[in-house]
């Protein structure tokens, strides 16, 4: 395992503290934060639900590491996703669009995952289209 980049880890912790102070940000029981962009009125998913979403995932520097293609939503089983998504999406009605911020321990943790460095805070813009 590569050595820990303590400066990077600290920048991510500082980002979380700053984000928590933004207007409209709600903090969930485990530290996931979200900001409602569009309020939906549909069904909320359960852990075994299949969800269809549009999303963009980026790091605190704004670098996009993953996203759906325009017009092609992704479908997932909720309980197979990272904890940050599971926590937020369980409370998100279909039709909603939220910005979700997941601390590293609820994302990919202390190990790198492809282009995502260890200790990365993950920022997602998620539109929940459908719950089945």
Where are these regions (language model features)?
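Cross-family detector of peptidyl-prolyl cis-trans isomerase
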Residues: 1-132
């Amino acid at each position: 395992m590569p050595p820990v980049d303590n400066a990077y880890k600290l920048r991510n912790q500082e980002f979380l503290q700053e984000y928590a102070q933004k207007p409209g940000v709600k903090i969930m029981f485990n530290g996931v934060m979200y900001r409602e962009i569009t309020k939906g009125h549909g069904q909320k998913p359960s852990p075994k639900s299949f969800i269809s979403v549009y999303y963009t995932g980026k790091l605190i520097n704004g670098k996009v590491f993953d996203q759906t293609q325009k017009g092609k939503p992704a479908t997932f089983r909720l309980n197979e996703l990272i904890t940050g998504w599971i926590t937020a999406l369980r409370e998100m009605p279909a039709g909603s669009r939220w910005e979700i911020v997941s601390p590293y321990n609820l994302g990919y943790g202390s190990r790198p995952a492809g282009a995502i460095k260890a200790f990365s805070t993950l920022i997602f813009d998620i539109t929940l289209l459908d719950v089945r």
